[in-house]
Curated annotation (Swiss-Prot):
Residues 80-128 are annotated as: RED subdomain. The keyword Transcription regulation applies. This is Paired box protein Pax-9. Gene3D superfamilies: Winged helix-like DNA-binding domain superfamily/Winged helix DNA-binding domain. GO terms for biological process: regulation of transcription by RNA polymerase II. GO terms for cellular component: nucleus. SUPFAM superfamilies: Homeodomain-like. PROSITE patterns: PAIRED_1, PAIRED_2. GO terms for molecular function: DNA-binding transcription factor activity, RNA polymerase II-specific; RNA polymerase II cis-regulatory region sequence-specific DNA binding. It is found in: Nucleus. It comes from Gallus gallus. The keyword Calcium does not apply.
């Protein structure tokens, strides 16, 4: 031929291509005549390795044709095997590939010659059965999944949880708008959709517990609608050894207007200074009226004590300790009589 290479014996061959069938047949015929392989190699100008390989294959298979001996391995992942593997996986989702291989042999589905390898079983589980099992888990998850919650209502700043919005009784009030008193106020806690209570769903439980409590507390928005007079005094102070009752607190906060903006939602009432009015009247200024016409006859005054007049009126020297409710009743009566 016009192309090829020359070996050490002077013969021509093409690298990577099989020896022609005519030369192969001639090698077999000379071998059957009893000629040694080395002599056949010199006579036909074919390498000794090629002659030996052709003769060995002929003695083994009886064929002189080139190609792989025996062909490829027969297919072991038949539909029957895949079906049994799927059954094993559905019965025991945590089964291993080597356990499936042993069970295929134990159940007689395969024998030791055609049983799939562990890697083949893993590939079947990953490609053919994995999607089916995931789809089955998804379908079962959808069946056991509760109905979806309604979308969260959106406010201009914060989004509120759906249990509060679904109640319909607690509507958030944006800043600058007069607060809605009563049951239309928002919850006591500042709403935030990223808090732990909202994520875990504890807010509705805490609201129910606090709503059924025996000590009702005013809501955040209700604070701004309530008058300053409704707050009890923060602390009881003593002036000249006497107990200063909530009368001073009443005198301070009774001058404040009730229609103030919703500042009380964020600042506690006792921490705020009294608002300026047109005429500042000190609760300590002396009165021109006679003591007998001003404070005589009230039930809380201790008549047995020695009266002192630091403010131009009769006050007892010592007062017995009373509860907050008694002090508030007395302060209301004094305020009414003073007005």
């Amino acid at each position: 031929p016009a192309f090829g290479e020359v070996n050490q014996l002077g013969g021509v061959f093409v690298n990577g291509r099989p020896l022609p069938n005519a030369i192969r047949l001639r090698i077999v015929e000379l071998a059957q005549l009893g000629i040694r392989p080395c002599d056949i190699s010199r006579q036909l100008r074919v390498s000794h390795g090629c002659v030996s390989k052709i003769l060995a294959r002929y003695n083994e298979t009886g064929s002189i044709l080139p190609g792989a001996i025996g062909g490829s391995k027969p297919r072991v992942t038949t539909p029957t095997v895949v079906k049994h593997i799927r059954t094993y996986k559905q019965r025991d989702p945590g089964i291993f590939a080597w356990e499936i291989r042993d069970r295929l042999l134990a159940d007689g589905v395969c024998d030791k010659y055609n049983v799939p390898s562990v890697s083949s079983i893993s590939r079947i589980l990953r490609n053919k059965i994995g999607n089916l099992s995931q789809q089955g888990h998804y379908e079962s998850y959808k069946q056991h999944q509760p109905p979806p919650q309604p979308p969260l209502p959106y406010n201009h700043i914060y989004s509120y949880p759906s249990p509060i919005a679904a109640a319909g009784a607690k509507v958030p009030t944006p800043p600058g708008v007069p607060a809605i008193p009563g049951t239309m106020a928002m919850p006591r806690t500042w709403p935030s959709s990223h808090s732990v209570t909202d994520i875990l769903g504890i807010r509705s439980i805490t609201d129910q517990v606090s709503d059924t409590s025996s000590y009702p507390s005013p809501k955040v928005e209700e604070w701004s609608s309530l008058g300053r007079s409704s707050f009890p005094p923060a602390a009881q102070h003593a002036v000249n050894g006497l107990e200063k009752s909530s009368l001073e607190q009443e005198a301070k906060y009774s001058q404040a207007h009730n229609g103030l903006p919703a500042v009380g939602s964020f600042v506690s009432a006792p921490a705020m200074s009294p608002y300026a009015t047109s005429a500042q009247v000190s609760p300590y200024m002396p009165y021109s009226a006679a003591p007998s016409s001003y404070m005589a006859g009230h039930g809380w005054q201790h008549t047995a004590g020695t009266p002192l007049s630091p403010h131009g009126c009769d006050l007892p020297a010592s007062l017995a300790f009373k509860g907050v409710q008694t002090a508030r009743e007395g302060s209301h009566s004094v305020t009414a009589s003073a007005l």
